[in-house]
Amino acid sequence: MEDYFEVLHSQDMELFDQVFHSECVLYGVVDGALNVRPFAAYREAVAARQSPHSLGEKRREEILLFDQISDTAAMVKPQLQMFGGVMQDYLGLSCIDGKWWIVAKLWERVGDA
C-alpha cells in the first residue's frame, strides 16, 4: 500500500505500472453518472495532471480496512487527502505470480481537506 500512496502523491508512472495491473478498471460516480476508466485512460489522466507533491501538498493517508480473503484476493479501504479533498477508495487486489496488483478501484470524494 505504501507504493499506492506514493504513486498518487508523486505520480511516478514507472511505479504506477508496478501497482496497477494493466487490466485494472477504475470506477466512480461523477455528476450522478457512473464513470468507468480502463487502465490506459486512468494512466493517461494521472500522467497529465500536476502531482500533489509538486503542488506542495503533504502526504496524509491511512488504511481504514484490510480484508484478505485468500492467498490471491484482498480488499483494502484507504483514505487520503489530495487536491483539497478527502478521498476513500475500495481497492480490489489480486496476487498474480506472487505479486499483489490493484485490479479494481472504486473511489469517492467524501469531504474537503
What are these regions (language model features)?
Residues Y4, F16, C24, V76, ...:
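Hydrophobic pocket/interface hotspot
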Residues Q11-Y27:
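Short, well-ordered alpha-helical segments enriched in acidic and aromatic residues
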Residues F20, L80-M82, L106-W107:
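Short beta-strand segments enriched in hydrophobic/aromatic residues
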Residues V25-D31, N35-V86:
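Surface-exposed, charged secondary-structure patches
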Residues V86-A113:
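Short beta-strand edge/turn micro-motifs at domain boundaries
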